[in-house]
Amino acid sequence: GENAAGGFGITPSICEEFFEAGVNVVTTGNHVWDQREIISHIDSEPRLLRPHNYPDGTPGSGAHLFTMASGYRVAVVNIMLRLFMEPLDDPFRCVDRFIQGHSLCKTADAIVVDAHGEASSEKQALGYMLDGRVTAVVGSHTHVPTADTRILPNGTGFQTDAGMCGDYDSVIGGDKGS
């Protein structure tokens, strides 16, 4: 969702369009603050996540427990990696502490981690660190889906990058003629 506003962030109205279309959760990353009006909206919208490893006091939340219509409870954790990205709190320690200690994870039927980052190696390292502790680790940020979807040795689903929701007749969602 972080590139929904013409490639730069997301607005409250776009966010609401997603939810009206049936989207359960919108994760973000390094473009989360590109549209200033999202700052006042993100605190009141638990379905819109910003990376969990932003410093304490940052508006919004990086994780939430969602209850599906079936009653199935899914914890979603949005984390931003650091290689070639802006320097945030250590994503590995942050997600490790969260998985170990947060009550949200103890009541979830599934835990899904969105690993927003540039480097495939960093996403893979996080996947292996969390293998057997979460249901899935799915990377985001590069706009290009990877063909490496698999189950890791201890049962965690993994994909280096899910790609983008956008126009494939484009350059990572932007005008190919620009």
Name what the model sees in each region.
Residues 1-178:
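Acidic, metal/ion-coordinating pockets
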